[in-house]
C-alpha cells in the first residue's frame, strides 16, 4: 500500500471509518497501516455521547484496533474551550459522555447563576 507520508492524520469517524453500523471498505487496513508504521493519527468526532475510551471500544465493532489516546471528541474540545475561558459553573444538557467529560466543572441543576450552558447530543 502506498500512502503519502504525513506527520499526522486527522480522521473523521462516521462516514469515513464506518457508516452508521456498517464498516467502510479498507478503513481497517488503513488504520492497521498507520499502527504498523507508527504513524500518528487522531480520530475526530462531533458525537458528544461517548468519551474517548467508549469511542475506541465502539471502533472494535468495526475491527478497528485503536486506543482512547487516538480519539478527540467534541466534548474534549468543549472542555478545553471552557477551561481557557475560565468558566467554572455549567448547566449541561446532554448524555453521560458529555457530562462525564465536563465533570471537573461545577454542574448546576438549573441555568440560574452559571457561566455557560452546554448542549450536546448526537
Name each model-derived stretch.
Residues 1-13, 17-122:
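HAD-like aspartate-dependent phosphatase fold
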Amino acid at each position: 500500500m502506498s500512502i503519502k507520508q504525513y506527520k499526522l492524520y486527522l480522521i473523521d469517524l462516521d462516514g469515513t471509518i464506518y457508516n452508521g453500523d456498517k464498516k467502510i471498505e479498507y478503513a481497517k487496513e488503513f488504520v492497521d497501516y498507520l499502527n504498523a508504521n507508527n504513524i500518528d493519527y487522531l480520530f475526530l468526532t462531533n458525537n458528544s455521547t461517548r468519551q474517548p475510551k467508549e469511542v475506541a471500544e465502539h471502533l472494535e465493532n468495526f475491527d478497528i484496533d485503536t486506543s482512547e489516546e487516538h480519539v478527540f471528541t467534541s466534548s474534549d474540545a468543549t472542555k478545553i474551550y471552557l477551561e481557557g475561558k475560565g468558566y467554572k459553573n455549567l448547566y449541561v444538557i446532554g448524555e453521560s459522555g458529555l457530562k462525564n467529560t465536563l465533570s471537573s466543572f461545577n454542574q448546576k441543576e438549573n441555568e440560574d447563576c452559571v457561566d455557560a450552558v452546554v448542549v450536546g447530543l448526537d
